[in-house]
Each structure stands twice: as structure tokens, then as C-alpha cells.
């Protein structure tokens, strides 16, 4: 029991003594000497194989210590602040990553514990046990140093600007650093930095008391800046911990960024106080800059850029992995910008490696960013310089000061900003170029003496029915569509208009007229209060005036088809000349059948059948009102019957002849005894006109015992009597130019047995022929 108490007291004393040794950074050499001595004694006491392995592991630890120290010192010269960020990551990520150094140190510590246990069991002397405990403690310290160095080396490799990090790693580091609220006071942050400096001094670094005071002041300032807007935690997630005192130690690094590096430049906005090496290290380490007004990109060296192929745009290395920025109100943005401007004025970080163009860009971007703060879609100070590998700095693709925007190829004007400034909108070209009118004049505002309604004192406004999109007058541009246009047509002469068709003369029926009196075809009606001097159309020039008829557009003699320049507009040609479109259909008869031998053979057989079986037609001239149709009248029944009754429609086709022509009513036509003279089987052809006769003719076929089997259409041409006059009256709306013939069949016919009445159906159901003079 006595020995156990003495051993426990000795362990406590050795622990206190070891903790006291840790407070002094100058005793690292003593610890190494004691480690060597204890290792030598333990190797002499333990077995041969174990001592060799232990000595080899100690020597490996020392070699690794020296190599990692040299590598870390060399990297700290180039990446000063990245080591500080790696220290902070080590403290914030308390239970985070487990490296290969941990496994090595844990194995060594286990072996040390085993050897220490053996030493305690072999010797019970106080001095030896004390030395063993000292060796254990020093070995633990060395393993902890090894773990911190391995983490530092890994973090340095991760923070290298030539090594890309994934978006997931960067976001995890941002989340760990940004949301680490365990250090609520600057004293706690200072304690963490003090412990990290002790580890560094145990490896041979001695920064001095001046560096320690400067670090403490920088940490306090950093804590005040970080916790000044603690209520806005979500927006400050990406606010990073960096040591401002370390930035003062590296003014030389900012100046060493020569013109060769400046040619590769960076893409930045409104400069903040974070313009020095800290922002470079943080942006290259994959950390988000979402709460900074500046985006600084560490570009690749010449050899690295030259090896790649791609468009001549700025290559976004790590800033493309930023999380989406949350919106903040205008007061917080203004306060943050003011704070960043004060920091830049106090510390002057914006002067390292910058030139006069950056300062000019800062002034102009501050001016434009302040104007766009009240707009939600704008991100102030987002991009101010776009750099390409072969052109250097370029002006931003957006409004800069009072200069107009300059669009680029790969992205819309202004980048991600959609601010609506005083953008000069291009005036669209006049849509009335084909009208042969002079260019539009500027818009004149209405004076109090001018009438807002169209009249003689106001120039009419031409509005096409299919106009482009209107650009209403406002801050962005002017109206490019509401343009005053001089009148195209001359005003109508006063007094009643002349006769519409002077060649026809006054019709006998005064109630029949072609156009409303007092108006001209194509001109405005004489309504009271109307003064329409322009024609609302699709931009086609007017070819008629109020003076009378003008020559047709084609300019050629009547009877010829319109030229290709008239776009084959047969309808317009019919209005101009009276020539119907069907007048220009060619090859109406089956004359050119030499190229079709089968068709020629079929036509020959058809003609033979017709000539062999056809009989001479029979007719009876008489008044069917008085003569009743019956088989006894003719002595036979007929296989084919043609009926052409005088429909009322025929009378109204020829103006002025209705008094001398008599027409039958529908009741008179349907009461004919056609079924009495029709044989079975038989066919009936009934002309019904082009109006109501189509339906009435079907009723007649049904009463007479026929069913409709075909509808033959007669397209009437007027090559011989073409005239620009439209022969219609108030009963018709369109000009009728065709007629229909309904074909009915009674009974059943077969080609095999009824060849005398039916044959090969090679004829078409369309007839194109000239019409008679009176329709």
C-alpha cells in the first residue's frame, strides 16, 4: 500500500511538473533530450526486438518532425494566412477529422504505454518511475505535435490555390467556421490562439511578445466585427475568421504580385477592407464570400492557363461554388458597405497590387451600386472588372457611371443585375416602309387649343392592325409606334357621287342598288361626324382613289394571268378586272393522253360502249303547268332524266331582267310527276343553282324516289364577257360563279349486268365551262 501511494503521489507530481513545462516554450530541447535518454534507458531494459522498434519509431518521428517543419515553414512564406485559417479550423473542428498522423501517434503512444508499464513493473525506484512518466508525457506531447502538424500540412495542401476543392468540402468548412459560436468572447479566442502558438513554439517558432500583443488586438477587433451584427446570423454565415495582424505582416506579398500576375487579374466588385492576402487565402481555400462586397479570384499561373482550352472569359475557380445569397434589407446592406469602406480607409488594404483603374472602378461602382440599392433584383458591387487571359481588364457588361451598356457574347448585359437605369432603348424601324411614306416625325404634344378627336386640325395617326409591341413613353424610351402619318387618300369631293356603273345606266328597279348611295367602293361612308382620311389595312398601298376607276395593278391587257410579282392574287385580280380565277385553268379537255397508255385504252372502250348503246334524245316542248307527265304521253319510261327548272336564283343573277323572266316556286318544282316517267333502274340530273336550291333539290329527289349519289359542280368562266362590274343585288352577298347539279339514282345497278347504262367512271365531278350571257 505504501508503495502504491508513493507511486500515485509521484504520478501527480510528474503531471504537475509536466504541465509546468508546457507553459514555457523554451523547454522543448530539454524534452527532446529527456525523451532520448528515457528511450535509451527503456531500450536497455526491454527486449532487443522491442527496443529496436521503439528507437526506429522515435527516429522516424524526429525525421518527420524536421521534414514537416521545413515544409510548413516554406508554405507559410507563400501562404501566410492559410496556416492561420488551418489553426482556426483545427480548434473549431474539435472532434472532426482523423488523419494518418493520429494513427501513427496512437500506435506509438500504445507502445510507449506498454513499455512504461513494463518499466514500472521491473523497477520501483522513484527516480526511474519519474523518468518513465516524463517520457510518457513527452511522448504524448510529441504525438500531439505530430497530429497538429499533419493536420496543418493537410490544410495547407487543401488551401493551395493550384488545387481545386469540391463545393461540398468548401461548404462544410464554411459551415464549421461560420457557425462556430463556442468562442463567445475574445479571451476564449485568444486562449485558443495561445495554445496553438505553444504548439508552434514547441517546434521551434518564436514570434515574440510583440506578435502576441498584436494577435490579441487583432482577435478582439475581429470578435467585435463578427458579433456586432449577431441578430443577422443567417446573413453572416459566411463571415470568416481571419487575423488582421497577420495581414500587416505580409505587405510585401501584396507588392510581390507583379504585372505578370496582374495580367491574370481577378473579378472583383466594390473593394472592401478584405482586399489583402486574407481574402486571397480564404477564396482559394473554398470558403464562401457571400457576405463580402468583393469577390476575389486567385487565378492560375501562366503555364496552368496556357495548358487549358476554352473561351476567353474569366475562369471562376472557387467563387462558382458559393451558396445562394439571402436577401437583406437596405439598412443592413448600407451599414455593411459603410463598414467595409471605413476598414479600407483605415488599413489601406486596397492599395496592394492595385492601380488607378481599380480606384476608378471603385468610384463608379459605388455610385451605380448606391443607385441600385432600392431595387430587389440588383446585387450591388457584384462584378466590376471582367478579365480575359489575353486582354487584361475590360469594362463591365453593364452601366458604368453615365456610359451606355456594352453587351457581351456569353452573358446578358449587366451580369446578374437587372437594374433598370436610364438605358437608351433603340427605336424600332418604321413598319410603314413599303407604303412609300416619308419617315415619321417626332410626336407633338396636344396643346389646350387642339382637339383630342380626329379632325381637320390634327394630323391623323396611323395604327396598323398588326403592329409590333408598343414601347410606351417613360423613363426607358419613347413610343416607337404612335407616329403621325400624312393622309394617303384625298378627301371626298362635296356633293352626290356619280353613277356606279355608267355603262349599264339607271336600273329599272330603283330599289336595286349595288353600293350604298353617297359612298364609293373602298372609300369611307358619308356618315355624319366621320372624317376618315386613311385606310386601315396591312400596310398595302391603296390603288384606288375617289376619282373613279383606275387601271388594274398588273398593267397588262385583260385576259392574262397576273404576274409573279402580284403573288398570284387572283381574287384581287378579279376585283380589278372582273376576270374570274377559273379563267386561267389550263388543259380542260382530255386531249393529252399519249403519255398514259392505260388511260387512252380506257377512253377508247368507253366511247365504243356509248356509241353502241346510246339512243337519240327525246324532248317535248310544252307548258308543264298544263301538261301532266305520264308514261302514256311518251309511250315509254326513261333511264336518264335531266331537269333544269327555272329557280328564283337565276332571275336575280342578271340585274334588270327579272321583270321579263318568270321563275317557278319550290312547290311548283316539287309537284312535277318525274317518278311517273322514271324507269328502274334510272338516273336523274337536277340543276339546283348555288343557293337554297341545294337543300330544296335534295327534297325533290327524295319525293321522286331517287337517292343522291353525286354532286357535280359547274365552275363558270367569263372569258368572253369579263367586266369589273359585280352583278348582284341586295339579295346576294357574294358573286356566284358556280352551280351544282345533283345526281340521283333509282334502283340498283351492277357493272357486270348493267353495262348498257353504266361504264368505267373516268369523268370528274367538276365542269369548267363558259357561262351564258345572262347566267
UniProtKB/Swiss-Prot annotation:
Cell compartments where the protein resides: Nucleus speckle; Nucleus, Nucleoplasm
Listed Basic and acidic residues bias regions: 1-10, 50-79, 100-117, 125-222, 229-278, 333-344
GO molecular function (one): methyltransferase activity
Biased composition annotated in UniProt, kind: Low complexity: 40-49
A Gene Ontology cellular-component term: nuclear speck
A Pfam family it matches: MT-A70
Phenotype when the gene is knocked out: Embryonic lethality: arrest at the globular stage of embryo development.
SUPFAM superfamilies on file: S-adenosyl-L-methionine-dependent methyltransferases
Principal localisation: nucleus
Keyword Nucleus: yes
InterPro entries: DNA_methylase_N6_adenine_CS, METTL14-like, MT-A70-like, SAM-dependent_MTases_sf
Source domain of life: Eukaryota
Span list, region Disordered: 1-424, 520-569
Polar residues bias (residue ranges): 375-400
Subunit text: Forms homodimers. Interacts with HAKAI, MTA and VIR. Associates with MTA, FIP37, VIR and HAKAI to form the m6A writer complex which is essential for adenosine methylation at specific mRNA sequences.
Family: Belongs to the MT-A70-like family.
Protein's name according to its UniProt entry: N6-adenosine-methyltransferase non-catalytic subunit MTB
